[in-house]
Amino acid sequence: MIDHKLKVSREYGGWISTILIFGLTIGIVIIKRGNIIDSIIFWIPIFLGISIFDANIRNITNDKYVIAILFIATIIGVLSILIDFLFLITYLLFLIIFFSRPYFKKIRKTYINTALGMIALVLSFFITLHFAGINAAFFSIALLGYMIGAEFTVSSFLHKSKQLLAYNIVPVFFILLNPFYLIFSISLLRIALTIKSDKLKYVGIGESIFLLVIVVYVIILSLLGINLVQISSVFFR
């Protein structure tokens, strides 16, 4: 367990995502092998990082479990960079985001840190999806639009403003770009979850699970050889 002195990520779903996503994807890879395995390797340190992202930097060295997680993530991260040098860009961006959190918090501009985190995550998807054989341009834009909804959701909970939840209707219209983008309609569940939840951690758990569903969905499409852009061109024909 993570030391109680640490500020555990408010998402609280990092561990859920880490365990489930790789349990499912490994099973899929056994059925059909391909370079998607490289994408899975790349995402291991990302999800390990999510699990401790909001931990207090000054106290991290006091927790042997967190140190072990960072060590494993670093080893796998190096292997990922050997697979594709572009991965180095995303890892460096994540590190900059992690260590700049105290500064942005001090000047009360944490939204900059959050925006950089979204860009880093979308960039990660762009690299891995391209590596898996999918042109990820449209998907990356749609993913960014979906992730912005997470911030509206958290703000809605903190400020008790249900109006902010209305943004989560926007991802539903991504289906106009591609019929397979219907998966982003999962954002509607944010509305119900936020209204029913009495603690932010439940909203965070739901958010992590929703992201997990999207990741697994895209990986399955990759293994099935479905090109999202080709499907989109047929849709608009």
State the predicted function of each range.
Residues 2-5, 49-61, 96-110, 148-163, ...:
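C-terminal ends of transmembrane helices
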Residues 19-23, 67-77, 115-129, 165-176, ...:
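Small-residue-rich segments of transmembrane alpha-helices in multi-pass membrane proteins
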Residues 89-165:
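Membrane-proximal helix-loop-helix units in multi-pass membrane proteins
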Residues 57-65, 79-85, 110-111:
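Helix-loop junctions on the outward
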